[in-house]
Amino acid sequence: MEIRERLEKERLFFDGGMGTMLQSAGLMPGELPELWNLSHADVIQGVHEAYIRAGAQIIKTNTFGCNGLKFGKAHGTPAVSTLVTAAVKLAQKAFQACGEKGCVALDLGPTGKLLQPYGDLPFEEAVSLYAEAVEAGKKAGADLVLIETMSDTYEAKEAILAVKEHSNLPFVVTFTFDEEGKLLSGADVETAMIVASSLGASAVGFNCGLGPKEIS
């Protein structure tokens, strides 16, 4: 059964956070965690393996902030494609090391810049930023894409378009809401869910916004 069908029919367990695990392992404030895919590959794979042993069936790549606004020759850092490829391979190796079968999700977070007209990032450029990571992830063998921590349905659309135009991978979208159940852009939960679902998301959810008290 393909992952697209499994997402629709089964209850699957993702892993947990990567950033907090890397901070515990020595990641310094302001240090780009995606660089650890090359400099601390053993640590990244170790985090993946810990989550797999805990029961995770889907592992996110260490690529949350991996885009051309931070990485590439212009920034004096490795190319996005290099970091994404390394990240996917580390997740795959983790499953192999644990003797388990599972799925690797290419993790895409926000670009970190506001979109026009509220900011200076054009829509087309944002799609292109996501597309670079999507193409590399697909080529490296990712099974699906996780578009996460979206606070704006407009930015979620950009990431979704990149996935649909540059791959045939299924995708999951998660949003982050404030205490009033609103995105930073002002959209409510229902609107966000409708937008993502109508664009073909295999699953829609939320993360990083509300704590247990607010959720209850």
Give each language-model segment a name.
Residues 1-216:
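Domain-level signal for soluble alpha/beta catalytic cores
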